[in-house]
Curated annotation (Swiss-Prot):
HEAT repeats mapped onto the chain: 495-531, 544-576
Disease note: Rigidity and multifocal seizure syndrome, lethal neonatal: A lethal, neonatal, neurologic disorder characterized by episodic jerking that is apparent in utero, lack of psychomotor development, axial and limb rigidity, frequent multifocal seizures, and dysautonomia. At birth, affected individuals have small heads, overlapping cranial sutures, small or absent fontanels, and depressed frontal bones. Infants show poorly responsive focal jerks of the tongue, face and arms in a nearly continuous sequence throughout life. Neurodevelopmental disorder with cerebellar atrophy and with or without seizures: An autosomal recessive disorder characterized by psychomotor developmental delay manifesting in infancy, cerebellar atrophy, decreased myelination, and seizures in most patients. Additional features include intellectual disability, ataxia or dyspraxia, hypertonia, hyperreflexia, poor or absent speech, microcephaly, subtle dysmorphisms, and visual impairment in some patients.
Function: Component of a multiprotein complex required for the assembly of the RNA endonuclease module of the integrator complex. Associates with INTS9 and INTS11 in the cytoplasm and blocks the active site of INTS11 to inhibit the endonuclease activity of INTS11 before formation of the full integrator complex. Following dissociation of WDR73 of the complex, BRAT1 facilitates the nuclear import of the INTS9-INTS11 heterodimer. In the nucleus, INTS4 is integrated to the INTS9-INTS11 heterodimer and BRAT1 is released from the mature RNA endonuclease module by inositol hexakisphosphate (InsP6).
Alphabetized Gene3D superfamilies for the sequence: Leucine-rich Repeat Variant (1.25.10.10)
Residues spanned by motif BRAT1-like motif: 819-821
Source lineage: Eukaryota, Metazoa, Chordata, Craniata, Vertebrata
Region (Required for interaction with NDFIP1): 100-200
Record region (Disordered): 741-767
Effect of substituting residue 609 to W: In NEDCAS; abolished interaction with INTS9 and INTS11
Record's keyword terms, sorted: Cytoplasm, Disease variant, DNA damage, Epilepsy, Nucleus, Phosphoprotein, Repeat, Ubl conjugation
The UniProt record lists the keyword Repeat: yes
Source species of the chain: Homo sapiens
One of the GO biological process terms: DNA damage response
Protein name: Integrator complex assembly factor BRAT1
Ligand binding (Zn(2+)): 820
Amino acid sequence: MDPECAQLLPALCAVLVDPRQPVADDTCLEKLLDWFKTVTEGESSVVLLQEHPCLVELLSHVLKVQDLSSGVLSFSLRLAGTFAAQENCFQYLQQGELLPGLFGEPGPLGRATWAVPTVRSGWIQGLRSLAQHPSALRFLADHGAVDTIFSLQGDSSLFVASAASQLLVHVLALSMRGGAEGQPCLPGGDWPACAQKIMDHVEESLCSAATPKVTQALNVLTTTFGRCQSPWTEALWVRLSPRVACLLERDPIPAAHSFVDLLLCVARSPVFSSSDGSLWETVARALSCLGPTHMGPLALGILKLEHCPQALRTQAFQVLLQPLACVLKATVQAPGPPGLLDGTADDATTVDTLLASKSSCAGLLCRTLAHLEELQPLPQRPSPWPQASLLGATVTVLRLCDGSAAPASSVGGHLCGTLAGCVRVQRAALDFLGTLSQGTGPQELVTQALAVLLECLESPGSSPTVLKKAFQATLRWLLSSPKTPGCSDLGPLIPQFLRELFPVLQKRLCHPCWEVRDSALEFLTQLSRHWGGQADFRCALLASEVPQLALQLLQDPESYVRASAVTAMGQLSSQGLHAPTSPEHAEARQSLFLELLHILSVDSEGFPRRAVMQVFTEWLRDGHADAAQDTEQFVATVLQAASRDLDWEVRAQGLELALVFLGQTLGPPRTHCPYAVALPEVAPAQPLTEALRALCHVGLFDFAFCALFDCDRPVAQKSCDLLLFLRDKIASYSSLREARGSPNTASAEATLPRWRAGEQAQPPGDQEPEAVLAMLRSLDLEGLRSTLAESSDHVEKSPQSLLQDMLATGGFLQGDEADCY
């Protein structure tokens, strides 16, 4: 412990135990406890208590003061547990009967403050820290702590109840470590006394008629099997599995959600092998007995296992497919495609759930689609994967939602009415439909998928969220479509689809809802980025009014839309698609740069300006015509606009653009390989000097040095990195250091106050490169980078500052001794 903190500690302990003194808030107490944990990790707790007896006095006074605040009492319990985690310190505290007074009946259990959840939570957390060694087990047994933990499992505070269950698992594992670690225990005996008591309690709870009791027992077992992979857990399952299996005989099955969690946790445990028949028998029974709400998660969990009996995997997959199979049977006159309906008998419970209400029907279908979406990309998914059937079922679900499905039975008619306009199911189905694009399927079904997506995009009743999902799914299908072998054109289905798609996209770009316009622009950007070089796509796009509409949206009243329009137009321009190639559109093609520069200069919102800077950076990096025509003028103009911006992200993006220009001018950063022979880089002085003059001419030095003193730390950090790269790049050329002898740094030093004040030198190109670089080498950029890497409150986070603040709250410090922040 630091001497400064040790000097403040007695006064702080006096403040904490004095009910008349105002105590700092719980956050300060939490930080104080964290500090003590750090201290005890580095030194002996016994030595700490012996050198600072005020800590023992603090714990002793807690037992005597009746009206102590609940926060300080909870802190003291946790602090005592932290000290007692070391067994020798546990014995030291036992000598003074401190621990029985804190954690036994004489302590807070008999006080009125026990009614405060914070105190009960502190008691549990203190015991959790204390229970690290065999002496702690005897202490728990001798003072009835385990029985108190049992009662706290049903606490009215969910946090306390959860912590009690976690503590029970920890005590069980500690008991087994002290007993038969590494050796499986016999079901009938040889359990350590503490473990035996816990197991008896769990068995009793599993047999209880009260569902909360069953839930508590199942949660304890789930946590145990999740945390402990020792052989004794196998004996634990052998002992308790009959009790667990008996829950399936009740109607209704109690705590079904916790029951599923337990089965999956046991199945995932490495202690159990796929040959464990009793476990898989229980799982198979559960798949038959549970309701649809809980069967789906259990089936998904089984299918995600790497090792599982094949018969059980088949059963689980059939359970997972039942809701979609019911949908297909209710809407298809002829038998559906093989694979989905084979072996999937009508399940009365599933049908009842689909017909019960709109919420239950939507919930079941959404969960099923989400489970299948999660399963589809996994290597252990069922094989063969019924791609065609799933595609057909998903299209059918979407048609039920838009009212175009043809019912084949009364169930189908009911589903048509229930799912009509159901946005929740539409979103889930579109997500899964997008995932199915990664698989193969017959051309007829692919055509159906694209058709239903186009209908969703075209339907006037589609909500903004549905349209966004439809755009995303359409993009995935288009990008995954096969191309004609040996040809740069798209496959046979896509050109016609694009000719139908772009008129719909035009309408969505004019939609009154800004979210729809934004989604349409994002779709256009992604499609152009991937397909900008495809002849079919270029022809269809330029034949439409989409580029002109996207250009008009640069003036949209909503800033998010303007930002998306900037990104879209930047991408279209990079591909030569922002305007038709006819001569009458030449002016439109040339004016885009000025339009974007105007947005950067005058737009009142930050999002469009940030988007413009990202577009300009990409243009410079990719050699866009507007950037390549006069690169220095382009960079100078953009940096000048960015330097005046009040948004720190715009200024940071300006530094990114400057770094790109720097790399193009001086070469990319060197790669450092520890195994490579370092060859000296030699560059003629004249070309290097000219390159540096170009950097001065575009105002890069002014911009970077102003940013170095920026009040926003990310900007200063980025500028520091840029200047370090520049300095290291220059340092590799010995010719510059030899050129011109001693540079005159007077002009650069005169400009330094302007840079600190955030002002650029006027004019920007009047600096001598050698003088600027000489000053650059004189700056401690490494030290500045280290300083910038520290958090803004690194001083206030110190333990000494914390103790001073807490003492100041109690009025123990005078003048400016406190470091209140």
